[in-house]
Each structure stands twice: as structure tokens, then as C-alpha cells.
């Protein structure tokens, strides 16, 4: 869980975490999930090695689905193609991720990092599709989840995750 105020470096912190997980922790791919397309720009290429890190954050243009034209249906096909590829980083919206999980199932994301920006948009409510999908992923214990938010609390009384999954953070 990365909880920090807006514009304080959560996206940059995730880049370091994801690159380490990809290189050293057996994770196949990193999927960054953002609430809207404009936030996807926070995850554009970054020359981290310029500042002493051992790798750079690089997202192939075709895998930053926030910058690509098309409908969610076409983007779901792109998510599927990404999962079948050897490329390592994908950026997409919450909606695209939800539709992809609905189509191909949570099992398709095994052994991957799922990083969810603006995590407070998730809810344990049965009405929250993204919340249910993330709870299912966490319950399978086959994915690494990084939650990023400025505030871990929602404005309503609904918890973000079910208690047994929240305890895993």
C-alpha cells in the first residue's frame, strides 16, 4: 500500500517496485490500472538510470492503452495480447481492466503485478466489479497487488477490501 498525498511520488515509487519485482521476484508482467486516461500519463517512460537506478521505466506505446484510440472491447483484446507477449509493462484504465477480467478471468493475471492507482475507488461492496475482481485476485494468492492512494478511506461506510484480504497488506 502506497498512501501519500497527491503529486508526492506514488507513481515513481511504483516504477521502482515494479522493476524490482520483474527482475528479482519472479513476476512475469506489471499491469498499472488507473481510473482515467489522463492519469496514464503519470506512467510514461522515465529514465530512472539517469538518477542511479539500474533500469529505466519503459512502456511500449502499444501497451499504454490510455494513449491509444479505440473502444474498451478493442483494448480488452490488447490486454489479452499483452498477457500472451513477453513485454513487461501495460497501462490501462480501471474500466479496461474490469472488462478484461470479465472476459478472460482472474487466473489470466496469475504471477503478475497489478498496481491500482486511486485505490480508494475500489470497494468491497457487491456492486463494485473492480472491488470483487481484486478481492478474487488477492484471495487466489497468485498476484502481487500494489495499492496507491492519497487516502485509503472512502467517503461512505463501505470498506475498500474485505477484511481477510485487507489483512494481507
Question: Predicted regions span which residues?
Answer:
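SF2 helicase catalytic motif II
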Residues: 94-96, 105-147, 151-152
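Walker A/P-loop
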Residues: 1-17
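Interdomain helical connector at the RecA1-RecA2 junction of SF1/SF2 helicase-like NTPases
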Residues: 144, 156-169
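Conserved H-loop
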Residues: 7, 35, 150-151
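Inter-Walker segment of RecA-like/P-loop motor cores
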Residues: 53-99
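Alpha-helical scaffold elements adjacent to nucleotide-binding pockets in ATP/GTP-utilizing enzyme cores
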Residues: 13-17, 42-50, 114, 129-133, ...
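Switch/connector loops and helix/strand junctions flanking conserved nucleotide-binding motifs
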Residues: 40-45, 99-100, 123-124, 154-159
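Conserved Walker A/P-loop ATP-binding site and its immediately adjacent core
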Residues: 11-13, 22, 26-56, 96
